[in-house]
């Protein structure tokens, strides 16, 4: 695309092995994508960069509040995320939120994403045992990530409290009617 400086996928799929279930996350917006799906022109680096201190959730700043000219990639051809013990962010925490408009169970299968049997076997059966013995990848060795996860969770909790306390009042012929958020 001639006008787009960056491409990526705002819709991603995560395979949760512990429950044998695929989940769809997103899409979140036309100029949004997960950093692991980015492909961008060198020209983009003249106007933006990753924040050195950001250990996760770096997309918003890099994409300048999602204003960078952008093209969406086909999710099935872009990435399949496997939830595992050394994920930078424990993907299982996402399931605690329950389903909503940007997070839902999917009928897609691992076979739709990965055609090679040896790769399917590696990601589905072998990776967890290998990661158990890979001490440097343990999240406890990523203090900056752990700190930022706590900060993000606190901001999200505060945001949810503020929004749950807000009320919308409709005045209908002199009678106030509270609308549910």
Residue positions per predicted region:
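Conserved donor NDP-sugar-binding/catalytic core segment of glycosyltransferases
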Residues: 1-23
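A conserved hydrophobic position in a structured secondary element of the catalytic/binding core
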Residues: 40, 58, 73
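Short, high-confidence coil segments that cap the C-terminus of an alpha-helix
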Residues: 2-5, 68, 76
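Short, P/G- and charge-enriched loop/turn segments at secondary-structure junctions
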Residues: 23-30
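Conserved nucleotide-sugar donor-binding
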Residues: 32-49
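Terminal low-complexity segments of carbohydrate-biosynthetic enzymes
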Residues: 107-181
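Acidic donor-binding loop at a coil-to-helix junction in glycosyltransferase catalytic cores
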Residues: 54-62
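Active-site donor/metal-binding and catalytic loop motifs
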Residues: 14, 75-104
